[in-house]
A protein has these predicted regions:
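Feature captures the FAD/FMN-dependent oxidoreductase FAD-binding
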Residues: 92-99, 149-201, 291-304, 309-312, ...
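Rossmann-like dinucleotide-binding cores of NAD(P)H-dependent redox enzymes
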Residues: 123, 127-162, 245-291
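Ferredoxin-type iron-sulfur electron-transfer modules in oxidoreductases and energy-metabolism complexes
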Residues: 18-49, 65-91, 219-220
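Local cysteine-cluster metal-coordination motifs and their immediate loop/turn environment
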Residues: 1-21, 43-65
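A conserved FAD-binding loop/helix module that cradles the flavin
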Residues: 244, 382-403
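Glycine-rich dinucleotide-binding loop and its adjacent helix/turn
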Residues: 77-91, 150-164, 196-251, 357-372
Length: 403
């Protein structure tokens, strides 16, 4: 594949990992060297071996003959066979200090590569553990916690300083961005997109309604609700909706997914939809929620929906769902999980002058990941909105190089 420049699969990898290179190393049985090569562009080889969206496979040259190479699967072979591979030695300190706000995949990626350049990084994370959405958004049946920790441990080996349960904002007890700008040579904001969007229907505040982010975050904290015998409806059709539905299923619930378009328009990856169906999740496609019904105690006891049909394409290119007259029906549920998307938390941007955001509340950056405020960079979901893990990791590496 190296005779083709740029290599198609590498060109489509947001982190720019040398895929043909580590394929060759695994083929030679040099799995530890393969892991080292992956880490040159992606400090989460183990996590990505489990949950990467593998866009590279769609451009694999093998597709010209039959099917793509199972790139993610071979990465899994590399990390499993290699076992523990220590972090490379860091160079002499440059004396520069970088503050990183957010201990998720983007923030930790930036910290790792900055440390390897000789700069001292400090990660400020508001929760009790590092990992961000890798820990609090992806269920353990997809990414075992001990395997995620393997990657984090190697990142920490480079000398990253960590301050857990530390928030940045303007509330009492929080650090301000201006304080950090005075103390550090640069700042990288990687706070993700964890603010839930509202669907805007009656009954949304009833007892038994929870956001998918909140639900999965509780699971990540080790708090497992008893859903035995419960009838759960997940509203939404993305990967987060699939994760929430499959998690609820494992906790004993009967689970339905309600999505307003057809199955062909589901934004979730095909493999995630397949797994959800295989495990027993019921799909109510071409249905739109109209009202969440409640009992005399204010708790959910039904979801009123209306049938939809597809009309003309909208601005996204997908056919617009149109309500079918007189087609309302009630779905018998007692728990509703909202999975209709998230947006960046405005805590930092809303309290810091000179930090521009776009109409979706995402931080505005240039091609070097620099924001509109001097010495402040940003990346990951805080810039793109909710996106993929590998895209966030790639942004962290790009920001590190720019800084």
């Amino acid at each position: 594949c190296h005779i083709t420049q740029p290599v198609p699969c590498v060109a489509l990898c947001p982190a720019g990992v040398d895929i043909p290179g580590y394929m060759a190393l695994v083929g030679e049985g040099r799995c530890a060297d393969a892991v080292r090569l992956i880490r040159k562009d992606n400090p989460f080889p183990t996590a990505c071996a489990y949950i990467c969206e593998h866009p590279c496979e769609s451009r694999c040259r093998r597709n010209m003959l039959d099917n793509s190479i199972n790139i993610r699967g071979i990465k899994r072979v590399a990390v499993d066979m290699a076992g523990y591979v220590p972090a490379p030695a860091c160079p002499t300190s440059t004396g520069k200090r970088i503050a990183i706000i957010g201990g998720g995949p983007s923030g930790l990626s930036a910290a790792y590569y900055l440390q390897l350049m000789g700069h001292q990084t400090t990660v400020f994370e508001k929760r009790k553990k590092l990992g961000g959405m890798l820990l609090y958004g992806i269920p353990s049946y997809r990414l075992p916690r001990e395997r995620l920790q393997d990657d984090i441990n190697v990142i920490l080996e480079t000398g990253v300083e960590v301050r857990l349960e530390t928030s940045v904002g303007n509330e009492p007890g929080q650090l301000s961005l201006e304080e950090l700008r005075k103390e550090y040579d640069a700042i990288y904001i990687a706070i993700g997109a964890h603010s839930d969007k509202k669907i805007g229907i009656e009954g949304e505040d009833a007892g038994g309604v929870i956001s998918a982010v909140e639900f999965l975050r509780a699971i990540g904290d080790g708090k497992y609700p008893d859903l035995s015998g419960k009838k759960v409806c997940v509203i939404g059709g993305g990967n987060v909706a699939m994760d929430a539905a499959r998690t609820a299923l494992r906790l004993g619930a009967e689970v339905h997914i309600v999505y307003r378009r057809s199955e062909a328009e589901l934004p979730a990856r095909v493999e995630e939809v397949h797994h959800a169906k295989e495990e027993g999740v019921e799909f109510q496609n071409l249905c739109n929620p109209v009202e969440i019904l409640g009992d005399e105690n204010g708790r959910v006891n039904g979801l009123k929906c209306i049938r939809m049909e597809l009309g003309e394409p909208d601005e996204s290119g997908r056919r617009r769902p149109v309500a079918v007259p007189d087609s309302e029906f009630v779905l018998d549920v007692d728990t509703v999980i909202m999975a209709i998307g998230t947006s960046p938390n405005p805590l930092i941007s809303g309290t810091t002058k000179g930090l521009d955001t776009n109409r979706w509340g995402c931080l505005v950056v240039n091609e070097e990941m620099a924001t509109t405020k001097d010495k402040v960079y940003a990346g990951g979901d805080a810039v793109t909105g909710a996106a993929t893990v590998i895209l966030a990791m790639g942004a962290g590496k790009t920001a590190a190089v720019s800084i």
